[in-house]
Amino acid sequence: MKFERARPFIAIVFIQCLYALMSIVAKLALNKGMSPHVLVAYRMAVASALITPFALILERNTRPKLTFKILLQIAILSLFEPVVEQNLYYSGMKLTTATFTSALCNALPAMTFIMACVFKLEKVTIERRHSQAKLVGTMVAIGGAMLMTFVKGNVIELPWTSNSRGLNGHTHAMRIPKQADIARGSIMLVASCFSWSCYIILQAKILAQYKAELSLTALMCIMGMLEATVMGLIWERKNMSVWKINPDVTLLASIYGGLVSGLAYYVIGWASKERGPVFVSAFNPLSMVLVAILSTFVFLEKVYVGRVIGSVVIVIGIYLVLWGKSKDKGGMLQPNAGCAETVVKIDQQKVPTPDNNQVVSISYHLMIPKAAARSQE
């Protein structure tokens, strides 16, 4: 019985460890000269090959009819994620560091909350304490992101960061990003979070009409692969040699990224059904901490006081938002629970749907996740 209760904790901690390692591997590949656009295309190719067979087999009897309208919506969905989001994410990571990227993207729940308010998927009542917590948490998380971007502070000295080489054996791992690169990278990372938030909103609307999550993910990966390939060919048209993959960390990043994406879909989806999306979201900062620790060894990355404080502020903001979401009326409904109407929950947001037989619960983690993840992917 105790193990049954502990399984969701073990599973999510395991996934966060995989996310952290994915951030490190991706950064190694980018440092080696791999194009972010090529990495996205190859990662989606692996994810498509992994997920499609399961979708064809497991949902062969339950998959609804695919209309042209739904297909067009999925094509737009795949533009937001993975094409735009992941290209911006990896481009931002290339200009900054793995730790900075992981920490800044922790502000995603706050940005999702803002987008949900814009699209009227989130109800805010100023008089309610939980609504106040969500608003304050959003502002705190954004403030932490700004603090990370513009305030560096003193270096926190660590004995092993004074070595001449990182664990990857290359002195270029010690390259310290310029402030201009940090600013440009931050803009790209924030834009990637915005794209992910748009993806969440559209995903919920599509799932209300096409209730086959696995098939939707497979279609999104296939279309994303095609769109990312076209984008990569256009972007790298003057240097087609970047598409060549050698049996080194660039190949590892492509395969590992795709495998983690596919595995995370199942594990996070299962954990969301077992304990709810707020439970899953609460573990996001773990990946950031693991990336920060690994980066000091692998990249000899310097740890700055300002970045640490900014990361802590972001985490505080996240938990304020998540606490507020957990207190929303009906916020803890579980899938397949009896309910008078069907709702689609986006990390605790509710969207009425035409059918009134069941409850579909998803969170922004449910589909393919960034290094991180991004936590998330």
UniProtKB/Swiss-Prot annotation:
Domain EamA stretches: 18-149, 194-322
Signal peptide interval: none
Keyword vocabulary terms for this entry: Membrane, Repeat, Transmembrane, Transmembrane helix
Source taxon at top rank: Eukaryota
Bilayer-spanning residue ranges: 9-29, 38-58, 64-84, 99-119, 136-156, 187-207, 214-234, 251-271, 279-299, 303-323
Family: Belongs to the drug/metabolite transporter (DMT) superfamily. Plant drug/metabolite exporter (P-DME) (TC 2.A.7.4) family.
Name the record gives this protein: WAT1-related protein At5g13670
Native organism: Arabidopsis thaliana (Mouse-ear cress)
Lineage: Eukaryota, Viridiplantae, Streptophyta, Embryophyta, Tracheophyta
